[in-house]
């Protein structure tokens, strides 16, 4: 009989004095009867969710990146990690256990249930600040829950959905508690939660509210030193758009088009409006070339104009991840389990800021090739993030600005806007329209403008950055990468020919696979690239070769890899 593994429903007690806010003490926890008994414990309960996020933060990296194109195991690697790399059975492999994601979901459900119980118990008699914060805490918990299910879906292809707070073992066969979902079902359930929120604490709470922790620390004017806390929760737009892009794989043409239209309109609007914040927030500009290492080489805020949700750690407070241990050849204990594969490095040009020549993502340390972007930088002779290597606990990004550009290009492609998609992927609007032309092409397709007005919002804020900022130079351009030679059609073609080309399935697939190839270059060691290939395989007739053709080069003998992928490319795990 299948049972869901039991997760202790205890929020870790977190210190509240300034920088001790995230201090954990595993021997001093709130038991079920005490949690939540007063307003201050609302915040402690929510930070219990963050503790679960810290536990899940590096899970996808070590589970999926060894199966993607970039990483290979070293002779030091544990046997279980080597087995993942060799595409042997994942069922029962310790790295493949989905426990961290279910623990997070349990924590979110429990927090929301206990918060509602507390609200009912005090009959809504709360301080003014609590009345403001409760909806934002619930909204944040909803997004953490959705992120947990999103990760389960993209890694395992299935999940058990439940909304109750688990206090004891329960049979997975109990359909009154659990609903087993495939990836389409996960997308549907998560999107419904993101769109409609939840009825809790006497009100309908949407899923897109943000908690401003700076004003919780200092209600009188905020405290900028704690601004990075606002990045603890993934953004609504990232989750909603990612899930929609996956859902299109399983929909009919009309429904898929509606989802692509949603992604295009909402991501484009979000990106354009974000430029108001500083001229280049979440954009692909020259600024990325200058600041790219700072997205990763950090233990705190990272490069804030690019980060859209992250997991933070603090060695002094015993909050640790395994990144440096697994990637660094000079780690002063057992470690250095994964390194860049030589064949993977061949896909980068010499100028590409992510390639081996530039030494911003990988480097030679202690005489060994190392994946170094999280903990070491050659810029300004800075070297390691800390003098004591074992103390380095890098920030793990959940989403960043690049994610939205890939989603936008993907959506424009499927809507037939091939010129826009190609421009976003390659060298951007600034190069497509030299001089920042004031009028975008008026071309239309099926009565819709191909170039949305949001690419030119107004004279001070747009993708050309005429007010002195940096304009859009594309995903490839912002990394000094190699442009993709994609199919196009002549301006002299007839309208009928242009229409047919726009919706040609082979053209759309060619553009999608170019995005996938660039995605592999961009998201190394972030627990994302393998799942992106799986998304494309699902989209195009469950074609395992989309994955296989991109990972096989690093293997001397790829026969086991092909056999495994042919059987199943989602990670296999049997819940008991």
Q: What do these predicted regions represent?
A:
Residues 19-71, 267-268, 545-547, 551-576:
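Membrane-proximal, proline-rich intrinsically disordered regions
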Residues 33, 60-74, 163-165, 206-234, ...:
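Short, surface-exposed recognition loops and adjoining beta-strand edges that mediate ligand/DNA contacts
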Residues 108, 187, 194, 260, ...:
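Inward-facing hydrophobic residues that define packing positions of alpha-helical scaffold repeats
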């Amino acid at each position: 009989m299948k049972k869901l593994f039991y997760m202790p429903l205890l929020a870790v007690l977190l210190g509240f004095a300034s920088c001790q806010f995230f201090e954990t003490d595993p021997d001093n926890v709130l038991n079920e009867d005490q949690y939540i008994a007063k307003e201050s414990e609302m915040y402690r309960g929510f930070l219990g969710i963050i503790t679960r996020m810290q536990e899940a933060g590096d899970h996808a990296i070590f589970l999926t990146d060894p199966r993607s194109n970039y990483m290979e195991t070293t002779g030091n690697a544990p046997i279980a990690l080597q087995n993942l790399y060799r595409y042997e059975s994942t069922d029962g492999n310790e790295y493949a256990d989905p426990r961290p994601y279910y623990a997070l979901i349990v924590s979110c459900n429990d927090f929301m249930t206990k918060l509602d119980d507390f609200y009912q118990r005090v009959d809504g008699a709360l301080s003014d600040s609590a009345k403001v914060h409760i909806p934002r805490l619930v909204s944040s918990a909803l997004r953490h829950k959705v992120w947990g299910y999103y990760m389960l879906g993209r890694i395992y292809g299935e999940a058990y959905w439940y909304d109750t707070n688990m206090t004891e073992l329960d049979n997975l066969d109990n359909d009154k508690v659990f609903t087993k979902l495939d990836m389409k079902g996960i997308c549907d359930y998560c999107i419904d939660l993101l769109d409609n929120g939840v009825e809790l604490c006497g009100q309908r709470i949407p899923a897109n509210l943000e908690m401003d922790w700076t004003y919780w620390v200092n209600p009188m004017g905020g405290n900028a030193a704690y601004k990075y806390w606002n990045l603890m929760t993934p953004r609504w737009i990232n989750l909603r758009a990612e899930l929609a892009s996956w859902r299109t794989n399983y929909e009919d043409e009309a429904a898929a088009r509606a989802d692509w239209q949603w992604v295009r309109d909402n991501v484009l609007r979000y990106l354009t409006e974000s430029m108001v914040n500083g001229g280049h927030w979440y954009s692909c500009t020259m600024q990325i070339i200058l600041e790219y290492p700072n997205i990763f080489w950090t233990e705190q805020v990272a490069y804030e104009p690019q980060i859209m949700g992250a997991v933070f750690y603090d060695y002094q407070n015993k909050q640790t991840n395994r990144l440096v241990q697994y990637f660094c050849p000079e780690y002063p204990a057992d470690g250095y389990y994964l390194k860049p594969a030589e064949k993977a490095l061949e896909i980068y040009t010499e100028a590409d800021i992510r390639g081996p020549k530039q030494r911003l993502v990988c480097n030679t340390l202690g005489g060994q090739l190392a994946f170094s972007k999280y903990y070491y930088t050659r810029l300004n002779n800075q070297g390691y993030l800390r003098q004591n290597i074992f103390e380095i606990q890098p920030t793990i990004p959940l989403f960043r600005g690049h994610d939205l550009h890939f989603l936008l290009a993907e959506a424009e492609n499927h809507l037939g806007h091939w010129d826009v998609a190609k421009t976003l992927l390659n060298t951007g609007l600034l190069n497509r329209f030299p001089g920042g032309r004031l009028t975008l092409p008026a071309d239309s397709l099926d009565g819709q403008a191909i170039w949305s007005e949001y690419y030119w919002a107004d004279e001070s804020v747009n993708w050309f950055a005429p007010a002195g900022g940096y304009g859009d130079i594309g995903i490839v351009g912002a990394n000094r990468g190699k442009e993709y030679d994609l199919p196009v059609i002549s301006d002299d073609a007839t309208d009928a020919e242009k229409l047919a080309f726009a919706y040609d399935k082979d053209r759309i697939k060619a553009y999608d696979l170019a995005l996938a190839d660039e995605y592999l270059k961009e998201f190394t060691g972030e627990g994302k690239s393998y799942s992106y290939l799986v998304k494309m395989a699902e989209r195009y007739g469950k074609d395992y070769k989309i994955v296989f053709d991109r990972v096989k080069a690093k293997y001397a003998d790829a026969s086991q890899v092909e056999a495994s992928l042919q059987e199943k490319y989602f990670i296999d795990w049997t819940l008991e």
